[in-house]
Every structure is written in C-alpha cells, then in structure tokens.
C-alpha cells in the first residue's frame, strides 16, 4: 500500500509499505529516500508519536494515510572549550551592590549613573 510522509518543510514523500511493516522499517525507507538517520526521525499520526517496535496496522494506518515527520531536537552536552568561554563571558564578573549592574572582573567602580558610579562591588556568585 502507499502512504505519504509530510515533512515540516511541506515536502511530501510517497512510500510503498505493507500494513505489517514496523515503524523502524518505515524510518529506514525514509532514510533511503531523504538521508535522514532513523534516530533523528519522529513520526506522528493522528496526534500520536509512533513507537519503533510497533507496526502500521497497530496504529490503524491504512492506504494513502499521511504521517508527519518531525526531526528530533539535538542538544545537551556543550564542548568544554565553549563551556569555558561561556563561563568567562557570563560568570567571571563583578556586580554593583546598589544597581546590580554586571561589570568586568577588574572594575573598581560601577559604570552606571543611577548608583552614582558606586565603588561597592562584589564578585558574581558561581552557578551551582
């Protein structure tokens, strides 16, 4: 039978499948056509995310049904050098005790007028 897979870009992919095919098989066919690795694919049908071990018939997917393809969000670990750069940019600062302005690490006075260029500075607290 023929089913359609619609991507977020609006492109529609046509696939030839059987009702007994697993979701893993469908993802493999999408990889063959589009080059998207199966671990990055999420298939949605009738508002539900399809699980790899189940078959098309389990979800009552029939001929000419449309599945929606969403890519899995990437994220998580930051490279150590980028982490150090972010920490230097965000955490290695001084804070004005009166107006809470963020200042460079070697500042001796606040740069803001509203606190009268106060010299009451503290080191920014580290993230836990």
UniProtKB/Swiss-Prot annotation:
**Crosslinked positions (Glycyl lysine isopeptide (Gly-Lys) (interchain with K-? in acceptor proteins)):** 76
Q: Which UniProt keywords apply?
A: Cytoplasm, Isopeptide bond, Nucleus, Ribonucleoprotein, Ribosomal protein, Ubl conjugation
Ranges of residues in domain Ubiquitin-like = 1-76
Assigned GO CC terms: cytoplasm; nucleus; ribonucleoprotein complex; ribosome
- The reply to whether Transport figures as a keyword in the UniProt entry is no
Q: Where is this cross-link: Glycyl lysine isopeptide (Lys-Gly) (interchain with G-Cter in ubiquitin)?
A: 48
Q: Which Pfam families match?
A: Ribosomal_L40e (PF01020), ubiquitin (PF00240)
What domain of life? Answer: Eukaryota
Query: Which SMART domains has this protein been placed in?
Result: Ribosomal_L40e, UBQ
Which GO biological process entries does UniProt record here?
A: modification-dependent protein catabolic process; polarity specification of anterior/posterior axis; protein ubiquitination; translation
Q: Where are the transmembrane segments?
A: none
MF GO annotations:
protein tag activity; structural constituent of ribosome; ubiquitin protein ligase binding
- UniProt cross-references to InterPro entries, sorted A to Z: Ribosomal_eL40_dom, Ribosomal_eL40_sf, Ubiquitin-like_dom, Ubiquitin-like_domsf, Ubiquitin_CS, Ubiquitin_dom, Ubiquitin_ubiquitin-like
> What family does the entry list?
In the N-terminal section; belongs to the ubiquitin family.
Please, what other remarks does the record include?
In C.elegans ubiquitin is encoded by 2 different genes. ubq-2 gene codes for a single copy of ubiquitin fused to the ribosomal protein eL40. ubq-1 gene codes for a polyubiquitin precursor with exact head to tail repeats.
Question: Which protein are we looking at?
Answer: Ubiquitin-ribosomal protein eL40 fusion protein
Query: Which organism is this entry from?
Result: Caenorhabditis elegans
